[in-house]
From Swiss-Prot:
This is Galactokinase. One of its GO terms (biological process) is galactose metabolic process. Its EC number is 2.7.1.6. The active site is at D209 (proton acceptor). It catalyses: alpha-D-galactose + ATP = alpha-D-galactose 1-phosphate + ADP + H(+). The gene is gal1. Galactokinase is a key enzyme in the galactose metabolism where it catalyzes the conversion of alpha-D-galactose to galactose 1-phosphate. Can also induce the transcription of the gal genes in response to the organism being challenged with galactose as the sole source of carbon.
Length: 519
């Protein structure tokens, strides 16, 4: 079983020289603050999701890749019963976490939003893992975790849709485990514990972000599957000649703060999709496996149960692409039939409760208690269309990759790939309502200036778009985005800010421990 690697140099980066200067700067900051060298570094990269958005928590496969930007944390242990959190970014002020002397797991005040809360949630899951697997390290729970002195450095844009929070949490969890004497952890275990970390700050993530960050490999994208179990399969992407394809990521600089806007955005989608699955199940008198974060059914669960109970066919195992596409098409056909034109507009709470055969109180208890949300009407028809259509597009992209041969027309491949990305953006905009005016604008500019496809990546409502182009068209695309979006929207933007906003990345190495032989 693959374990998280430890590196003794920086050759795992695509640009080791640039990162050597970054590590040296972080080391200098650490020595100035704590008057000692760090024992080690922990790092985890951001990710870009190529296609498949808001479908991971419905257990449908997605296609992300780890990218060159990452979160690094420099670490040393301390005899003090506290954790000192610092950051090279002055926006993130120092925080001190007092460790309970009785060895209890720390708690989080969810009403007080600070960057330190993401470390707290990392400490909670790391501590629980230690209690479960290595209780002797903490005297069976009677002894606190080791005190830590930490400085973080991250170049994953916060709120940019590139999973800065997952990168931060995974790097933090790795740091805590290593500092407390756990030198080896499987990638599978690290995914399991990190997936639930952000739940402690009220964000119900589905697992794709953490999986992509942990399993990333240089020059390989990832197929992340959630059934029959959570797993990531690296695969090489087609090499096109004479001009290879490239992904450009543009941060709109409109921050998508999942924690603060979850009530009406991210968490509402989680709830709407859970309601949608139970709505469809009720139509066919099906009992769904309780596998969502709300302990309800999921849209994947509905599809599998429909095929098993109504059509007497086995559950889809996720590997047969043609079968998957056919089943998504059937789900989309059913969706159109099962919702009346009036219902397609949206449901009030009372209407949904009636459809599910519940009182308003029962509906509230099942769907609106565990994850707080705010809405006027739930648009469960739209969310259903988005989930099944984007899940189908993931499979269509996979098929495109598998079928491509070196002798094939690269232009034909790029047009087909781009069309699927554009269809995904249209669905995010119209059916999932997770795009934004700024995201629509950068996608429009892209398609007029050398982009084959462009779509919102990450949670949405701001953040970043991913653009598909080729190396020969890259300079024109960067210039167009710079002149027509960034300089218009942000006239005072600096060159360094521009460089951070527009990222061209190849698939990068995943999470690791770094113990440099020399500093």
């Amino acid at each position: 079983m693959a374990t998280v690697p430890t590196y003794h140099d920086l050759s795992f980066y695509s640009n080791p020289k640039e990162n050597k200067a970054r590590y040296a700067k972080l080391l200098n900051s650490f020595e100035q603050k704590y008057h000692c060298k760090p024992d080690f570094f922990s790092r985890s990269p951001g990710r870009v999701n190529i296609i498949g958005e808001h479908i991971d928590y419905n257990y449908f496969s997605v296609l992300p890749m780890a990218i060159d930007v990452d979160v690094i944390v420099s670490v040393t242990t301390s005899d003090d019963a506290k954790v000192e959190l610092n950051n090279t970014n002055p926006e993130f002020k120092e925080e001190i976490l007092e460790l309970p002397s009785d060895g209890a797991v720390i708690e989080i005040n969810k009403t007080h939003h600070t960057w330190g809360n993401y470390f707290r949630c990392s400490m909670i899951v790391a501590h629980k893992y230690i209690l479960e697997k290595y209780p002797e390290l903490v005297s069976g729970g009677k002894k606190p975790l080791k005190g830590l002195k930490l400085i973080f450095d991250g170049n994953v844009p916060t709120g940019g849709g590139l999973s800065s929070s997952a990168a931060f949490c995974v790097a933090s969890i790795l740091a805590i485990l290593k500092a407390n004497g756990i030198n080896t952890i499987t990638k599978e275990d690290l995914v399991k514990i990190s997936v639930v970390s952000e739940h402690y700050v009220g964000v119900n993530t589905g697992g794709m972000d953490q999986c992509a960050s942990i399993y990333g490999e240089q020059n390989k994208a990832l197929l992340v599957q959630f059934k029959p179990k959570l797993m990531a399969t690296p695969f090489k992407m087609p090499v096109l000649k004479p001009h290879d394809m490239v992904f450009l990521i543009s941060n709109t600089l409109v921050e998508a703060n999942k924690q603060e806007t979850a009530l009406t955005n991210y968490n509402l989608r989680v709830v709407e999709m859970a309601v949608a699955s139970e709505f469809l199940a009720k139509k066919f008198n099906l009992e769904l496996p309780k596998e969502s974060n709300l302990h309800t059914g999921t849209l994947r669960g509905f599809m599998d149960e429909y095929y098993e109970k109504h059509l007497k066919q086995p559950h889809w195992d996720g590997s047969d692409i043609d079968m998957g596409v056919q089943r998504m098409q059937e789900m989309l056909r059913l969706t159109e039939i099962m919702f009346s034109e009036e219902q397609k507009v949206g449901f009030k709470t009372e209407e949904l409760a009636k459809e599910l055969g519940l009182s308003v109180e029962e509906f509230t208890k099942v769907f609106l208690t565990k994850i707080p949300v705010k809405y006027e009407r739930m648009k469960i028809y739209q969310r259903t269309v988005h989930v099944y259509s984007d899940a189908m597009r993931v499979l269509q992209v996979l098929k495109l990759f598998h079928q491509h041969k070196d002798s094939d027309d690269p232009q034909k491949f790029m047009l087909a790939f781009g069309r699927l990305l554009n269809d995904s953006q249209r669905s995010e905009d119209i059916y999932n309502n997770s795009s934004s005016p700024e995201l629509r604008e950068v996608c429009k500019i892209s398609l007029a200036n050398g982009g084959y496809g462009a779509r919102t990546t990450g949670a949405g409502w701001g953040g970043s778009a991913v653009h598909l182009t080729t190396h020969d068209k890259l300079a024109k695309l960067v210039e167009a985005l710079t002149e027509q979006y960034y300089k218009k929207q942000f006239p005072k933007i600096t060159q360094s800010e521009l460089n951070a906003a527009v990222v061209v990345s190849k698939p990068a190495a995943g999470s690791c421990i770094v113990q440099l032989a020399e500093y």
